[in-house]
Amino acid sequence: MGQLIQVEASPMGQVALFSTDRSLTGQDGVSLTPDIPETSDGADPPHELARRLFDADRLIDHVHVLSNTVSVRRRQTWDDEAVERARDVIANLFVYYGTGSAPTDADEFEQLRVENYNATLSHIRAHNEDLWVMRVTPDEPIDPFLPGQYTTLALGYWEPRADEARDNLKPDQDHKMARRSYSVSSSMIDESGQLLPPHSPDVEFYIVKVKPGEEEIPALTPRLFLKGVGDRLYMGRKFTGHYTLEGVKPDDSIVFLSTGTGEAPQNAMIAELLRREHRGRILDVVCVRYRSDLAYTEQHAVLVDRYPTYRYVTITTRDPENEGKKVYIQDLITSSQIEKDLGAPLDPHRTHVFLCGNPSMIGLPKWTEEGLVFPETLGVCQQLYEKGFTIDHRKDRGNVHYEEYWTER
């Protein structure tokens, strides 16, 4: 087993520069495109690295290696998940280099954990067998981050699965890690019912175990749900995202609309607003399939009882009493029920709406030269736009904020 390479990343638009702690070429650089051979036994480091990068991210179309700098170009702008994936490929270049073999024994598994994992699973509250509230404690303290932001969790592909599905792994992928981004959640209150402090040594996540489908085999959660308190995993040290309370004024009305575990970042922001003693009204609406899919109802009940400006509303779509009369979040807006629950009109001049969950609920439009083009299925974005609201777009901050948050891919 070779040593991990230390890597620093600098993404700039569609190009990212990765600086390594050792030279990978001589004085002459090497430029490579995806048409290099799929397999290359005995390939030199630049060719092997490029092949692995192309396998890991089909949007990468050019790799240039010169000494200790790797320049990688994508057909789309680099995001945090893509940067972490490429960094992982480069860091592991000399792990099993040239062998094409997977780890096979307990000692190798443990060595991979030592080299790749940087955090401990410190708390699990299993709301049901497929829905966890869990906390992760990093080995080193993390910098403060904003409520609503997200980071990455990962486990190695060498870890066992909780189901019988077979991973469709690429060559050399068995010693790499399955990664997924998760918004940070919050239980909001402690055991005595007091608001939690803004920063804690551990980080909370709200996670559903994703089951294999006909076309998609989830990689992370089937492994995660075999873990227990004290087990090790990887957690990204960078927390990012624009789904935050930026621009919210103390007297603004705040409406949180989410589906399923999309409730996670809403919880973190609600706790922050209450810590700030926010004066405006706060409404939190969560839509799930069954009432048993709600893991934070007790905490919200305490907040509703304590804070007169806070309201928590849940709707379910598959419980027996709703058969034949399903109600979705969009229906609450159409009927004006959401304004009754808020206790105030949806006034775009003094209201912020936060959307997290099923993309069909959000209904994010495409921005074209002719204007906004909304999906065929009516989503909340279109409903609010027609009421005079402005949807976040790139660096332009509006009063409709969104985080598309769907099942594992």
Regions found by a protein language model. Name each.
Residues D41-A56, E108-L112:
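Short amphipathic alpha-helix segments
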Residues A50-T69:
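Short acidic amphipathic segments
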Residues R135-V255, T317, T390-I391, K395, ...:
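FAD-binding FR-type
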Residues A9-S40:
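Short glycine-/aliphatic-rich beta-strand segments at the starts of folded cytosolic domains
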Residues V285-R409:
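Reductase modules of NAD(P)H-dependent flavoproteins
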Residues L121-I124, V184:
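Conserved hydrophobic positions within beta-strands
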Residues S258-P265:
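Ser/Thr-glycine-rich phosphate-binding loops at phosphate-binding pockets of nucleotides
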Residues W78-Y97:
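Charge-rich, low-aromatic oligomerization/scaffolding segments with amphipathic character
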